[in-house]
Regions:
Chain A
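Extracytosolic ligand-binding ectodomains
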Residues: 2-17, 26-421
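N-terminal signal peptide c-region/cleavage motif recognized by signal peptidases
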Residues: 22-24
Length: 421, 286
């Protein structure tokens, strides 16, 4: 009798252990780990944290049932019949070598299925090279260096328009102003951070300007994180270009604007690449000093109201509680990439990387958080549906000025001089 | 001509600010042979103090720099008491590594509490005010910061060279044991030196809030330039730090404008290497 009781007790224990191990194994298998690799420290940390929050917001939409949101995968819970997306964060500090080693760590040790990253083009380049060698998927939201999709990579996919596309758009806008408003813009200055992103943006600016007959009178690279930008702004002021194209991230952007105010100089028009211009946190600190600058954007609250209402719902429900601000043009694109990847996985019906890559390369994906409404990748990974508009900021509100189809406000041209503000 | 004058003035104003940041480091390095790797983070902390005093209490950095100076004096003393004192005389790299750890702690603490957001005070008394001299535009916040820096530096020079306390500091720097035999409390001297070093960088950081955005990485390049200035000017020499800093400010400004903006730091470090090769103890070292 005692032996039977003891045997029964032991058998029950073993059965419970097996069931727990089994359910743990089942639970472990029901997650898809996605790495997010962004600058969480360093000069671009504000933007990096926003990018992570955007991906987390997208993960919440995918993982939970959201009947109120009309976006792909929002109405169901998880993908592949209940798999949840688990985000694994990593910080590349804005350094290419750290990006490379963190990508290796994410793929090899954390065993992530794919990586979304890296904001800085200089970090995206080596990290995506790691992915390509490992035959793993790399999704890039907002890194804008055109060179990234000119490498012929199979596993790399990028959402944002390139600096080449934006440069063409900036020049088209200048030509429009010259023709319709008799703007008389003939000379151009370019100021840019001395990194992969900045140098490439400057090269594209040069190409686009020379095609349009604009003369480049100042080419001013600077070291990001500089203690001052006095020499740089003095060089611009001495050359006095009609227009300035800027590629300065975060704090450097605010330092540049404040230094121009200090020396009392402004060009007639300033157009900015994917930079501090697009960051609401930077514009909040600049206040009215930031007014009348322009830049390329794939998102603004005003655009979203008109063209992307579901993005506003996602923003209010999952993004703003984390970031204390609306989406910005950069971070939202990182969120888009998780949606696109999740849709591709769902269509593949499995976690077969090659199958998913084939789907990413050939299919078109609806995207509630993309201005064009869809995402489709060319060979090389560039989003053929990438769209950005030119906005002008006034009182921390971005108003769309070009293309004319999206125009919502009349631009202030030329920029109001400092003394008259 | 106005370009030349502008570049000259920019260089001098930057140099004076660099001098104040570097002066405390020079004193500490000269007296105790200790490199404070957290010096840039002390600057960052001072800027945050004045930013938050301005943002929450509405007190302009023109006045709140005093609070930053006092806070950083206390932080400097605490750093000595808690970290440096326990690592001096142990392994050669112990104080260096300890201050490196402190720098990581301060930076990550501020990153965690205040986020990496760039924070810029607006509506300050001197905001955006400039005046013109001979065609050169002078920013009032930068000018006032430079003047304050010069006053503090001159006060420090007077303290070190003309007071009994200053002679005690110099004696401790020259020979600690001999100074103790002369009845100098070297323990208190070390404590004071760390405190003064903190106060100098606290004043600098506090005033910089009038025109520079504060974020957790703001101190990094200032710290590096401070090391260059200390090595160039000579360890322990405040006068050397002042002259070296102005030289660095001018080299940065002239190279940045007349050669190319992107080479300004190349020129700074090149000058440093040349001087060190010719005179390893720096221009005025003890």
């Amino acid at each position: 009798m005692r032996l039977n009781k003891r045997f029964g007790f032991m058998a029950t224990l073993v059965l419970c252990a097996v069931m727990m191990a089994g359910s743990a194994a089942v639970a472990a298998e029901k997650v898809i780990k996605i790495g997010v690799l962004f600058p969480l420290t360093g000069t671009a940390a504000v933007a990096g944290q926003n990018c992570v929050n955007a991906v987390l917001a997208a993960a919440d939409v995918i993982n939970k049932k959201n009947p109120d949101i009309k976006a792909p995968l929002a109405a169901q819970e998880g993908i592949l019949g209940g798999y949840k997306i688990v985000i694994v964060k990593a910080d590349h500090q804005g350094k290419p070598d750290v990006a490379k080693s963190e990508a290796e760590r994410l793929y090899n040790q954390e065993k992530v299925f794919a990586i979304i990253g890296c904001y800085n083009s200089s970090a995206t380049k080596p990290a995506s090279a790691v992915a390509e060698r490992a035959k793993k998927i790399f999704m890039c939201g907002c890194s804008s260096s055109a060179a990234l999709t000119e490498r012929g990579y199979k596993y790399f996919f990028r959402h944002a328009p390139t600096d080449a596309i934006e440069s063409e758009e900036f020049v088209q806008y200048i030509q429009y102003l010259n023709k319709e408003k008799k703007a008389g813009i003939k000379t151009l200055g370019v100021i840019y951070e001395n990194t992969e992103f900045g140098k490439h943006a400057a090269e594209e600016a040069h190409k686009a300007a020379s095609k349009a007959g604009l003369k480049i009178v100042a080419d001013v690279p600077f070291n990001n994180g500089a203690t001052n930008l006095n020499s740089e702004v003095q060089t611009l002021k001495a050359a006095n270009p009609d227009a300035v194209f800027g590629a300065a991230l975060g704090g450097d952007y605010s330092l540049w604007v404040r230094t121009m105010k200090q020396v009392g100089w402004l060009p007639k028009i300033s157009l900015n690449y994917c930079t501090g211009y697009q960051n609401p946190a930077v514009q909040k600190e600049l206040g009215r000093d930031g007014d009348y600058f322009m830049g390329g954007m794939g998102y603004s609250p005003a655009l979203a109201k008109q063209f992307m209402p579901e993005a506003i719902k996602i923003e209010k429900k999952y993004y703003t509680p984390r970031s204390n601000q609306p989406f910005d043009s950069d971070s939202i694109q990182e969120g888009v990439m998780l949606f696109v990847l999740a849709q591709a996985i769902e269509k593949a019906g499995s976690l077969d990387t090659e199958k998913i890559v084939k789907i990413l390369q050939t299919e078109e994906f609806p995207s509630a958080m993309s201005l064009s409404g869809n995402v489709k990748f060319n060979p090389g990974g560039q989003n053929a549906k990438a769209l950005s508009v030119i906005t002008q900021i006034k009182n921390q509100s971005y108003g769309t000025v070009f293309p004319l189809k999206y125009k919502a406000v009349e631009p202030v041209f030329p920029m109001t001089p400092w003394a008259k503000r | 001509m106005s370009n030349f004058l502008q570049v000259l003035i920019d260089g001098i104003l930057s140099g004076l600010l660099y001098a104040l940041v570097a002066a405390g480091l020079s004193l500490m390095w000269g007296v105790m042979n200790v490199i404070n790797f957290a010096h840039g983070e002390f600057l960052m902390v001072a800027m945050y103090i004045c930013y938050w005093i301005g943002a929450i209490l509405g007190i302009d950095p023109l006045f709140s720099w005093v609070a930053a100076g006092i806070f950083l004096f206390i932080l400097g003393c605490l750093t000595y008491k808690v970290i440096i004192k326990n690592s001096l005389g142990k392994a050669a790299m112990a104080p260096l590594l300890a201050t490196f750890g402190l720098s990581m702690l301060l930076k990550n603490f501020c990153m965690n509490r205040f986020t990496p957001n760039f924070r810029l005070l607006s509506g300050t008394i001197m905001e955006g005010k400039t005046f013109t001299v001979g065609g050169a535009v002078i920013s009032l916040p930068q000018l006032v910061t430079a003047i304050f820096a010069l006053i503090v530096l001159l006060a420090l020079v007077w303290l070190v060279s003309r007071t009994r306390l200053g002679w005690a500091i110099q004696a401790t720097a020259m020979d600690k044991e001999a100074a103790e035999l002369m009845g100098i409390d070297t323990e208190n001297i070390y404590l004071l030196v760390f405190g003064l070093s903190g106060a100098c960088v606290g004043v600098a950081g506090g005033l910089m809030t009038t025109y520079l955005a504060v974020h957790p990485e703001v101190g990094s390049l200032f710290s590096l330039i401070a090391f260059v200035i200390v090595a160039l000017g000579g360890f322990g020499s405040i006068k050397g730090a002042l002259l070296a800093a102005i030289l660095i400010g001018l080299v940065e400004s002239f190279a940045g404008f007349y050669i190319a903006a992107v080479v300004k730091y190349v020129a700074v470090f090149a000058i440093y290497l040349i001087v060190i090769l010719v005179r390893p103890k720096g221009l005025f070292g003890w």
